[in-house]
From Swiss-Prot:
Modified residues (Phosphoserine): 400, 417, 634
Compositionally biased intervals (Basic and acidic residues): 627-649
Domain Protein kinase residues, every copy: 60-366
Function: Serine/threonine-protein kinase component of the BUR kinase complex involved in transcription regulation. This complex phosphorylates 'Ser-120' of the UBC2/RAD6 ubiquitin-conjugating enzyme (E2), leading to monoubiquitination of histone H2B, the localization of the PAF1 complex to the chromatin, and the silencing of telomeric-associated genes. Also required for histone H3 'Lys-4' trimethylation. May phosphorylate the 'Ser-5' of the RBP1 carboxy-terminal domain (CTD) repeats. Necessary for the recovery from pheromone-induced growth arrest in the cell cycle G1 phase.
UniProt-listed Enzyme Commission number(s): 2.7.11.22, 2.7.11.23
Descriptive protein name: Serine/threonine-protein kinase BUR1
Effect after changing residue 240 to A/D/E: No phosphorylation of SGV1
One GO term (biological process): positive regulation of transcription elongation by RNA polymerase II
Assembly mode: Belongs to the BUR kinase complex composed of SGV1/BUR1 and BUR2. Interacts with BUR2 and RBP1.
Phosphothreonine carried by residues: 240, 405
Length: 657
């Protein structure tokens, strides 16, 4: 610097004569007054750049978030200059260590060296929030780095879970060939992917599959793979065994083997291939130990011939199980014999018996019908792993709003709503006291011993399915003979009914209670009740409700007997005696003033109660056409009476109930 303070002019030298370019500005040299030292003052640039990276501002814009992983987050972005959609993978920088992640370094390095149509392409690196250059200790603090990748419309996980996408076998073969092509290129470049799964297989708008997410990939030692042996076989190099997502982890990794090869990627391809058919991961272990059990349940416990090295691995105790292989039973409905052989060789327990990517491309399964398609056509809808939750919610909502299907046996015509038609009144179900719900000790309808049947001459508290038990088991006492509780001159009550019988028409006369035209009982009548279709206490008390004629109705009004136009909509008795095969009693004459209560009277069984037949020794207590004669000023019933020696005892009732 000159004395007047103007910048010093550099003298012309031989070097300046050959200098290329033009010096934009001469640095200003300043002197410190305290130390008397000269120094050059540096000016801060408008934008601090990182070598090989592009600044984020004014170049890219973030849109929606596509997903999040262990080592970063993925966003959908737009390149502002070209307005093209890109995928931006944000790299998480640890604040404590202030170091660039080793996984990101490996991924960037490997992607820069790979160039294949089935491998994702790294466009460039982007950063934002430039730090203060005076703070050298925090060069990466508050700085975000992005990996700019081409935007893919779908990944294989979202495609398989999308209910609106159905892949044919020809499309599956096309996808498998593309996966094997990309994986073979990686292995031949002496890299292991170590994280093959459906979420890391991307699909572009042209149906081209691309392997992505090389965060766990690394260089392996040894020879590259060939048609027989995997890459790195026999090298003796050790790697970490905590790699690959658990559900896609090879059995040698589960057992703790550290000297693994590129065969761990082939196992993941086999899991992806089986997932095409079940639409979900096929080996979903809950823990690392449980993952081994799940694998051996599908492929069987390895024997000495299947996998000789397994018993020398750290997790060899899992090989002591005794599981049978179920691969054929599980996937036999989806694949042919050739397809099962292809899947079995991809999922071989011994890594040295597993197919390589180079040999798998030439398997006979790809040459049988149907042949692989030339191009995969996917719908315009985007399908990513982040959309799986939405697919499940839509599926649950559609199932809850689905119209109920038609019942079995009902044919839905065209244009008809698949609902059950109105079938009218449905019969009532059995009551809780039904015989089918009672134990044998309390079941009245259960057949008692034969001795009990012969001793009974009356119905023991009749029971019906719809109405239950009768109100009483023993008839009430009747009035003495000849006693008229309404008086002998009560003609208004005596002329209420008319019939063909010669007996008086006194409906309240206790003597006439058994007349065919009178069915009114009296508590003063001690005359034993006969058995027959006219007995009030025989069978079910509700059997008279639904008869074939209006006179058989319980609510019968005699005023409308002679009016044929009256419509009595009564349903016929369900268990009619007319449907029975029992012989009809020819002595019974319904035209003699007796009403047909529940069909014709059957011989050999009690009226309206077929469960308790009457033995011939007890007699057939039936109504006959013999009229009642009046003797000594009173009516006397000359009809057959039950044997007094066969009275119904209380002990019998107790035994029965």
């Amino acid at each position: 610097m000159s004395d007047n303070g103007s910048p010093a002019v550099l003298p012309k030298t031989e070097f300046n004569k050959y200098k290329i370019g033009k010096v934009k500005s001469t640095p200003a040299i300043q002197r410190d007054a305290k130390t008397n030292l000269t120094y050059i003052k540096l000016r801060k640039r408008s934008s601090e750049k990182v070598y090989g990276c592009t600044v984020f501002q004014n170049h890219y814009r973030e849109d929606e978030k596509l997903g999040q992983g262990t080592f970063g987050e993925v966003y959908k972005g737009i390149h502002l200059e070209t307005q093209r959609q890109v995928a931006m993978k944000k790299i998480i920088v640890s604040v404590e260590k202030d170091l660039f992640p080793i996984t990101a370094q490996r991924e960037i390095t490997i992607l820069k060296r790979l160039n294949h149509k089935n491998i994702i392409k790294l466009i460039e690196m982007v950063y934002d929030h430039s730090p203060d250059i005076t703070n050298a200790a925090s060069s990466n603090l508050h700085k975000s780095f992005y990996m700019i990748l081409p935007y893919m419309v779908a990944d294989l996980s979202g495609v398989l879970h999308n209910p609106r996408i159905n892949l044919e076998m020809c499309d599956i073969k096309n996808m498998m060939l593309q996966i094997l092509e990309g994986l073979n290129y990686i292995h031949c470049a002496k890299f292991m992917h170590r994280d093959i799964k459906t979420a890391n297989i991307l699909i572009d708008h042209n149906g081209v599959l691309k392997l992505a997410d090389f965060g766990l990939a690394r260089l392996y030692y040894g020879c590259p793979p060939n048609l027989k042996y995997p890459g790195g076989a026999g090298s003796g190099a050790k790697y970490t065994s905590v790699v690959v997502t658990r559900w896609y982890r090879a059995p040698e990794l589960v057992l703790g083997d550290k000297q693994y090869t590129t065969a761990v990627d082939i196992w993941g391809v086999g899991c992806v291939f089986a997932e095409f058919f079940e639409k979900k991961p096929i080996l979903q272990g809950k823990t690392d130990i449980d993952q081994g059990h799940v694998i051996f349940k599908l492929l069987g416990t390895p024997t000495e011939e299947d996998w000789a090295v397994a018993r020398y691995l750290p997790g060899a105790e899992l090989t002591t199980t005794n599981y049978k292989p179920t691969l054929r039973e599980r996937f036999g409905k989806y694949l042919s014999e050739t397809g099962l052989d292809f899947l079995g060789q991809l999922l071989a327990l011994d890594p040295y018996k597993r197919l390589t990517a180079m040999s798998a491309k030439h398997h006979p399964w790809f040459k049988e019908d149907p042949l692989p398609s030339e191009k995969i056509t996917l719908p315009t809808e985007e399908s990513h792993e982040a959309d799986i939750k939405r697919y499940k919610e839509e599926m649950h909502q559609s199932l809850s709003q689905r119209v109920p299907t038609a019942p079995r046996g009902h044919i839905v015509e065209k244009g008809e709503s698949p609902v059950v038609k109105n079938l009218g009144a449905i019969p009532r179900g059995p009551k809780k006291d039904d015989a089918s719900f009672l134990p044998p000790s309390k079941n009245v309808l259960a057949k008692p011993p034969p001795s009990k049947i012969r001793e009974l001459h009356q119905n023991p508290r009749p029971y019906h399915v719809n109405s239950g038990y009768a109100k009483t088991a023993i008839p009430p006492p009747a009035a003495p003979a000849g006693v008229n509780r309404y008086g002998p001159n009560n003609s208004s009550r005596n002329n209420r009914f008319s019939g063909n019988s010669t007996a008086p028409n006194n409906s309240r006369n206790p003597v006439n209670r058994f007349h065919p035209e009178t069915n009114v009982s009296s508590k003063y009548n001690k005359v034993p009740l006969p058995l027959g279709p006219q007995s009030r206490y025989q069978g079910n008390s509700n059997e008279s409700r639904y008869k074939n004629s209006p006179n058989d109705s319980r609510y019968h009004n005699p005023r409308y007997v002679n009016k044929p136009e009256t419509n009595f909509n009564r349903q016929p008795q369900k268990y009619s005696r007319q449907e029975s095969n029992a012989p009809i009693n020819k002595n019974y004459n319904p035209s003699n003033g007796s009403r047909n209560m529940a069909g014709d009277h059957h011989q050999g069984s009690r009226p309206s109660h077929p469960q308790f037949p009457i033995s011939p020794s007890q007699g057939q207590h039936q109504l006959t056409s013999k009229p009642i004669e009046k003797k000594n000023g009173s009516f006397k019933d000359e009809r057959a009476k039950p044997d007094e020696s066969k009275e119904f005892q209380n002990s019998d009732i107790a035994d029965l109930y």
